[in-house]
Swiss-Prot record:
The gene is spdl1-a. One of its GO terms (biological process) is mitotic spindle assembly checkpoint signaling. Its main location: nucleus. Residues 493-511, 570-583 have a biased composition (Basic and acidic residues). This is Protein Spindly-A. The keyword Cell division applies. Residues 1-390 form a coiled coil. It is found in: Chromosome, Centromere, Kinetochore. GO terms for cellular component: nucleus; outer kinetochore; spindle pole. Residues 487-611 are annotated as: Disordered. Belongs to the Spindly family. Required for the localization of dynein and dynactin to the mitotic kintochore. Dynein is believed to control the initial lateral interaction between the kinetochore and spindle microtubules and to facilitate the subsequent formation of end-on kinetochore-microtubule attachments mediated by the NDC80 complex. GO terms for molecular function: kinetochore binding. Residues 552-567, 602-611 have a biased composition (Polar residues).
Amino acid sequence: MEESETVLKLRRQLKEAEEERVKAAHYGLELLESQSDLQNQLEEQRNEMTGTIENLEQEKYSLQREVELKNRMLESVTSECENIRQQQKLILEQLQEQLERNHHRELGEIKDKLEKLKAELDEARLSEKQLKHKLEYQTEVLANKSEELRMMSERVHETMSSEMLTLQLEKTELESAKANLEQEVNELQYREQQLLLTNGTQSRKLEHLQTEKEEREKESVGYFSALEKAREANQDLQAQLDIALQQAQDPNSKGNSLFSEVEDRRAEMERQLISMKVQFQSLQKQHAFSRQQMHRMKVQIATLLQMKGSQSDPEQLERLQAMVAQKNSEIEALVMKVRQLEKSQQVSENGPAVGSSDNLGQGDETYYVDLLKMKLLNSSKENEKIKDELSLQRMKALAESQRVLELERKLFANDRHLKLSQGENMKLRVSLDEIKMKYEPDEMGKIHTQKRRKEQLPLDFPMDNTSAAVTSGTEAQGLYDATAGETCTAESTDGRIHSKEDLSLSTKEQDPSSVAVKPKELPNGPPPKERKRVRIMEDENNAQDLNKRNTHNCSVTSASPRSTSEDATSESKRFDEEQEKRKQERKSRLRAPPVLHVPSKPNATTQCPQQ
């Protein structure tokens, strides 16, 4: 039940996907028609816009000439005002910079004095602290010495031995040495504190010097910018001087008829130049728009090819579903047969017991029983021989089916790799176009004008259930396996001939299957590039022998793990139906003009020719 539900669910999903595919095709046709209409409207609007823009540019040019004549009268006054303003501005900026420099200088001097006073204050505090510590230490030492003198004076009056006196003297000497060492340690600590203080002052001085260095760098940058501004002003003045010299040498002021005629021709040529510029800009915008559309279309084609490579073939899925359903039915039949055999075995086990009781009553019929046993043994031996032959034929059929499945699996894997490589190739082309558009736009335009390529979208073709039919995809895959580096597109007839030869060699090396090449004929036009279709077919003699063996095996046993006879008959029927469908579709294509469809699901037929 669960398997049937899954099969129904998958069929429903397949039907929905086919409906979506048909809808997408209709929508694509509508979009193409609307795009052509919009393209025509855009062309008309562009022509109108170019005409209006040209008229407006001519009017603009005439008005500009009038405005220039009027502006020349105002330029002298504005130039004088601007010069005065610039002079005042420069003076003000110089004063501000001078005041800022003086302020920074005074501020730095005050900071230096403050740092020096802080350092002197820290040194005075440290020296005061050290003197206090020394004073405390000297008072302690004085108290200890006075105490020792008092103790010595008391002990002098007492009677002591010479040893005690020597020990006492040694003790005093050691204490004096200890006091000297402590004093040295304190002096070293004082020295360390002074060094730390001087280190801190030096670090502060270093920071101050770094800040001064940064300020000097900023001042140098300011001076450099001022120098650049002065250079720019000098260049402007030089340009104004050149303009003034040209105006002084203007032939219009002389009133010569030849120069006036030349001026009229120049104005007319400028008008023509304006019109040509307007047309060039409009054509350039149109070219950029079409290039963006082509780039977007290439990106979409790359994504579609990648989706084709990632998705699976619906006809292959249907065939696998049919095989799964057939194997499930075979398993059910085998289970029923096993149950029947178990029941018959139980009956046969119960039968001999009853027969033995009858034999006790009928001892005279033992001869007939032995005869029947001998016949039964002979028939069982013949049955075992037939079963051995049947198992051998089954193994052969299983090996053949496994070989066919392996070849189909390899073919579909190669087709998938081909689609992925085509998607990657299209992405690389898109990235190459982007890089050329980014770094070499002029070269890109020249290449497009010199060499044009026509890319054809992959069309949908029905596939056989028994043979995986692939078009130029398998051709390019065989070429890739044979040469390890060539692409799926051929730019000349020689390349196509070489690809055909490589394809024939590669298909002969892969499997002993026949290759059927069927070119597609188109009405009303030159014949296009031939599309090849590789089909795996079994040999007729092998198929007939296999059908005979399978019919014989099916007569012996009702069901088997590999019912090859039913598969062969069903596959032959499907093959005939597919051949009839192809003939009808070929007739319909010859009658009606071909329509370009963009498939929403992957197909085994892919082609990327370049013309």
